[in-house]
Amino acid sequence: MKKTKMINSDMSRVIAQMGHFDKLSIGDAGMPVPMGIEKIDLAVDNGIPSFMQVLTNVLEELEVQRIYLAEEIKTENPKMLENIKALMPETPITFMPHSDMKQDLNNCHAFVRTGEMTPYSNIILESGVVF
């Protein structure tokens, strides 16, 4: 059995296959995922698992050099923005319109669906390198 915190086999595989500048998205239960993009559906109930639980777990495994968030999170979900910044205080953030973020999912290796039910709880993680 794996010793690390990430025990979901699909998430482990996707993260292991990622290289520098590759992207992975984590989002709320309502985010539409483009056809052809792998969706790893973890949602089991309202808020289970939460966006922050999944993000925290992924950050145990993935080196992240930049994150992308919807511009709307600033006004529509400032608490979630505060939580993300607290978890990743040194990581640069690029804000974009939510409509552009949905289009950018086409450039992600996978989308991880959580049980989160709060608006604009979506992130794109850009992979860094560990050396």
Curated annotation (Swiss-Prot):
Protein name (database record): D-ribose pyranase
Superkingdom in the source lineage: Bacteria
Keyword Nucleotide-binding attributed: no
Family matches, as SUPFAM superfamilies: RbsD-like
Protein family membership: Belongs to the RbsD / FucU family. RbsD subfamily.
Enzyme active site: 20 (proton donor)
Its biological purpose: Catalyzes the interconversion of beta-pyran and beta-furan forms of D-ribose.
The species this protein was found in: Pediococcus pentosaceus (strain ATCC 25745 / CCUG 21536 / LMG 10740 / 183-1w)
Gene: rbsD
